[in-house]
Amino acid sequence: MLLNTKQMRLRRAKATRIKIGNSRQFRLSVHKSNNHIYAQILDPSSNRVIVSASTVEAEVKKQYPSGGTIEAAKYVGHLVAKKSIESQIYEVAFDRSGFKYHGRIKALADAARSAGMKF
């Protein structure tokens, strides 16, 4: 069975979400495109967005006009961690949405950890 790249990513995402879904923790969900990166913290019971940050926000776009860089991902990670700590969310489960833990995804996760989040 041959799968293309998107189908393989969605398959990995499904497996990860099954593992995370069993825990009753807040979920830090990350999505990336070629030009932007998005991070959201979701409530475990209702799947509602509590906190979000992305490279399309005006604050981030001022500093990083090109949102597809590792530096922009680090800034988004720091920003989402800062917002979550203000909302008194300190511990989350990391949902990388099937993306490999490398590059911008890793940079965002490391920046969020260094800003005080635990996962």
UniProtKB/Swiss-Prot annotation:
GO BP annotations, alphabetical order: translation
Keywords: Ribonucleoprotein, Ribosomal protein, RNA-binding, rRNA-binding
Keyword Ribosomal protein: yes
GO cellular component term of the entry, any: cytosolic large ribosomal subunit
InterPro entries in the cross-refs: Ribosomal_uL18_bac-type, Ribosomal_uL18_bac/euk
Molecular function (Gene Ontology), one example: 5S rRNA binding
A Pfam family hit: Ribosomal_L18p
Similarity field: Belongs to the universal ribosomal protein uL18 family.
Complex formation: Part of the 50S ribosomal subunit; part of the 5S rRNA/L5/L18/L25 subcomplex. Contacts the 5S and 23S rRNAs.
Task performed by this protein: This is one of the proteins that bind and probably mediate the attachment of the 5S RNA into the large ribosomal subunit, where it forms part of the central protuberance.
The name this protein goes by in its record: Large ribosomal subunit protein uL18
Species the sequence originates in: Nitrosomonas europaea (strain ATCC 19718 / CIP 103999 / KCTC 2705 / NBRC 14298)
